[in-house]
């Protein structure tokens, strides 16, 4: 528990104190955000706000994780390092996307094919490595079985597992990317979901199956304490960044941050065996993504729009909701989704005779 607290506090302090330094640096370098011309007119005033703030989130999370290990003397684990690999790798893809936008002074960076390739490369490497590194109990970081709150009996097989990992990682990172359209929305929502994973992973650690004396409801997962430590570091980094990203934002996380956070969620879900539970915990990300899919499909079929604009947070902006009202109400929705997801997690534990 001490390591989890240290990771969260270090990441919070690094992010909180490091972000203003990055804001000044990026302003001097001219790393300002370009704004979509077809977006809400109120967003035009945000043009030039420093972006690529996700670099601070990643660095703060890494600092929290590694310093916590240094202080506690706990060894590194395959699961924790794999999650950080995905977070950093997708952060790099997002950084390239943001950098191209800045250099070419446009709102579009990497081509869809280039971003797809980058996400696929990171995800497939994760998928290949996650089914290696068996520990003394015979557990792997990943599992070929589809998981809800723990593994089900449905397996995709060792060959298809990297493909499954890619689907989960790409879908989640793109969902967070779509949500990152209002000041503080993605950062605040991400902090809540990471907080949920701190609770889930620490609970799994306290209820691990013993090799020869498995208790009712126990969990067969590898390295849950280290996963909790990663989630705590990411949560602290998001909260520290949110201080400066809250409306009116002094800096945006950019694709650097949104892709990294989405990758972290997906990889944590895989190593904690909660792949489908992530759909509930990240309910706001799902709503935002579905709004885009519905808008595109309906427009192609009828040439009419369901929403004023997608993702759905822009719909409410164009309906003349103040931006802060949209953000706070969406945070409430996210909080309810997280609470419901944690309730499902605990109910499943009780249904297996735990408690």
UniProtKB/Swiss-Prot annotation:
Main location: membrane
Claim: Transferase is one of the keywords in the record: yes
Named cofactor requirement(s): Mg(2+)
Enzyme kind, highest EC tier: transferase
Pfam families: Glycos_transf_4 (PF00953), MraY_sig1 (PF10555)
Membrane among keywords: yes
Biological process, per Gene Ontology: cell division; cell wall organization; peptidoglycan biosynthetic process; regulation of cell shape
Transmembrane segment boundaries: 3-23, 56-76, 80-100, 120-140, 156-176, 185-205, 224-244, 251-271, 276-296, 330-350
Pathway the protein contributes to: Cell wall biogenesis; peptidoglycan biosynthesis
GO molecular function: metal ion binding; phospho-N-acetylmuramoyl-pentapeptide-transferase activity; UDP-N-acetylmuramoyl-L-alanyl-D-glutamyl-meso-2,6-diaminopimelyl-D-alanyl-D-alanine:undecaprenyl-phosphate transferase activity
InterPro entries per UniProt: Glycosyl_transferase_4, PNAcMuramoyl-5peptid_Trfase, PNAcMuramoyl-5peptid_Trfase_CS
Subcellular location: Cell membrane
GO CC list: plasma membrane
Keywords tagged on the record: Cell cycle, Cell division, Cell membrane, Cell shape, Cell wall biogenesis/degradation, Magnesium, Membrane, Metal-binding, Peptidoglycan synthesis, Transferase, Transmembrane, Transmembrane helix
Catalytic activity annotation: UDP-N-acetyl-alpha-D-muramoyl-L-alanyl-gamma-D-glutamyl-meso-2,6-diaminopimeloyl-D-alanyl-D-alanine + di-trans,octa-cis-undecaprenyl phosphate = di-trans,octa-cis-undecaprenyl diphospho-N-acetyl-alpha-D-muramoyl-L-alanyl-D-glutamyl-meso-2,6-diaminopimeloyl-D-alanyl-D-alanine + UMP
Highest taxon above the source species: Bacteria
E.C. number(s) listed in UniProt: 2.7.8.13
Similarity section: Belongs to the glycosyltransferase 4 family. MraY subfamily.
Role: Catalyzes the initial step of the lipid cycle reactions in the biosynthesis of the cell wall peptidoglycan: transfers peptidoglycan precursor phospho-MurNAc-pentapeptide from UDP-MurNAc-pentapeptide onto the lipid carrier undecaprenyl phosphate, yielding undecaprenyl-pyrophosphoryl-MurNAc-pentapeptide, known as lipid I.
Name of the protein this chain belongs to: Phospho-N-acetylmuramoyl-pentapeptide-transferase
Lineage: Bacteria, Bacillati, Actinomycetota, Actinomycetes, Frankiales
């Amino acid at each position: 528990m001490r390591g989890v607290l240290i990771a969260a506090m270090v990441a919070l302090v690094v992010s909180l104190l490091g972000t203003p330094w990055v804001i000044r640096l990026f302003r001097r370098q001219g790393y300002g955000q370009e704004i979509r011309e077809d977006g809400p007119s109120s967003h035009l005033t945000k043009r030039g706000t420093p972006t690529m703030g996700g670099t601070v989130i990643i660095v703060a999370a890494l600092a929290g994780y590694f310093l916590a290990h240094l202080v506690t003397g706990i060894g590194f684990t395959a699961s924790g390092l794999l999650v950080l690999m995905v977070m950093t790798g997708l952060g790099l893809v997002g950084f390239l996307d943001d950098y191209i936008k800045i250099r070419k002074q446009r709102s579009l960076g990497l081509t869809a094919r280039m971003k797809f390739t980058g996400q696929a490369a990171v995800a497939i490497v994760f998928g290949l490595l996650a089914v290696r590194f068996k520990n003394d109990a015979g557990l792997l970081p990943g599992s070929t079985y589809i998981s809800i709150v723990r593994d089900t009996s449905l397996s995709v097989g060792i060959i298809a597992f990297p493909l499954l990992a890619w689907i989960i990682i790409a879908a989640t990172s793109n969902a967070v990317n779509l949500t990152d359209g209002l000041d503080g929305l993605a950062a605040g929502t991400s902090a809540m979901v990471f907080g949920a994973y701190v609770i889930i992973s620490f609970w799994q650690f306290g209820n691990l199956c013993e090799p020869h004396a498995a208790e009712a409801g126990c969990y067969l997962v590898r390295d849950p304490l280290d996963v909790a430590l990663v989630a705590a570091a990411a949560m602290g980094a998001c909260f520290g960044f949110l201080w400066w990203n809250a409306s009116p934002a002094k800096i945006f996380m950019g694709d650097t941050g949104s892709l990294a956070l989405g990758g972290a969620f997906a990889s944590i879900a895989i190593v904690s065996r909660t792949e489908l539970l992530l759909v509930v915990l990240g309910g706001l990300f799902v709503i935002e993504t579905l709004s885009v899919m519905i808008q595109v499909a309906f427009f192609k079929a009828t040439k009419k729009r369901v929403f004023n604009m997608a993702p759905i947070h822009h719909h409410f902006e164009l309906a003349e909701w103040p931006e802060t009202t949209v953000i706070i109400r969406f945070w409430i929705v996210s909080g309810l989704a997280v609470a419901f997801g944690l309730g499902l997690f605990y109910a499943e534990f009780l249904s297996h005779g735990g408690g």
